[in-house]
């Protein structure tokens, strides 16, 4: 960082299991109302796996396929040229299928999956402004500078009380 640069502030949003479940059920209700039944679901790995399982249960959809696109390296989230490492073979061109992800961020992964499955419906729980054009449905918009922490990314941690008793 040079003298003229200021540190970039990163904001965090923590999604709990309860919130994730509520949002997934809300998304399922919207999808059932607007699209009726789907032949199958394509989960974008890894973040779309758990939302896809919840949506599959709520919508009575048992055929769940996956697609794996690698575009980030490491937990620091360094973006690289995206590469499909596992295509969604069972989904054909996507007709009758629902693509599911936890979050659409920059839209890089979503764009690639949409190219693979042009006839599919794309839905995610959370969308950032840059990624919104790539999804048909989402539950909550998140600011572009926010890092979303999902339940599978975090662990419960004991935090000691602020006040200790005198006997300790």
From Swiss-Prot:
The keyword Heme does not apply. Guanine binds at residue 105. Its EC number is 2.4.2.-, 2.4.2.22. Xanthine binds at residues 105, 148. Mg(2+) binds at residue 102. GMP binds at residues 105-109, 147-148. One of its GO terms (biological process) is GMP salvage. Pathway: Purine metabolism; GMP biosynthesis via salvage pathway; GMP from guanine: step 1/1; Purine metabolism; XMP biosynthesis via salvage pathway; XMP from xanthine: step 1/1. Its cofactor is Mg(2+). Keywords: Cell inner membrane, Cell membrane, Glycosyltransferase, Magnesium, Membrane, Metal-binding, Purine salvage, Transferase. 5-phospho-alpha-D-ribose 1-diphosphate binds at residues 46-47, 101-109. It is found in: Cell inner membrane. One of its GO terms (cellular component) is cytosol. InterPro entries: PRibTrfase_dom, PRTase-like, Xanthine_Guanine_PRibTrfase. Homotetramer. Purine salvage pathway enzyme that catalyzes the transfer of the ribosyl-5-phosphate group from 5-phospho-alpha-D-ribose 1-diphosphate (PRPP) to the N9 position of the 6-oxopurines guanine and xanthine to form the corresponding ribonucleotides GMP (guanosine 5'-monophosphate) and XMP (xanthosine 5'-monophosphate), with the release of PPi. To a lesser extent, also acts on hypoxanthine. Belongs to the purine/pyrimidine phosphoribosyltransferase family. XGPT subfamily. This is Xanthine-guanine phosphoribosyltransferase. It comes from Gluconobacter oxydans (strain 621H). The lineage of its organism: Bacteria, Pseudomonadati, Pseudomonadota, Alphaproteobacteria, Acetobacterales.
């Amino acid at each position: 960082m040079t003298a003229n640069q200021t540190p970039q502030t990163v904001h965090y949003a923590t999604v709990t299991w309860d919130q994730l479940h509520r949002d997934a059920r809300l998304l399922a209700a919207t999808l059932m109302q607007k699209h009726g039944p789907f032949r199958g679901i394509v989960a974008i790995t890894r973040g779309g796996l758990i939302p896809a399982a919840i949506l599959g249960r709520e919508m009575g959809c048992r055929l769940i396929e996956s697609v794996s696109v690698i575009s980030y390296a490491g937990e620091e989230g360094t973006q690289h040229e995206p590469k499909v490492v596992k295509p969604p073979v069972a989904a054909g061109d996507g007709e009758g299928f629902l693509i599911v992800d936890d979050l659409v961020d920059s839209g890089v992964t979503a764009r690639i999956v949409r190219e693979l499955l042009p006839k599919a419906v794309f839905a995610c729980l959370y969308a950032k402004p840059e990624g919104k054009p790539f999804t048909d449905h989402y539950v909550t918009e998140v600011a572009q500078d926010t890092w979303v922490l999902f339940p599978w990314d975090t662990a419960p941690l004991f935090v000691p009380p602020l006040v200790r008793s005198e006997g300790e």
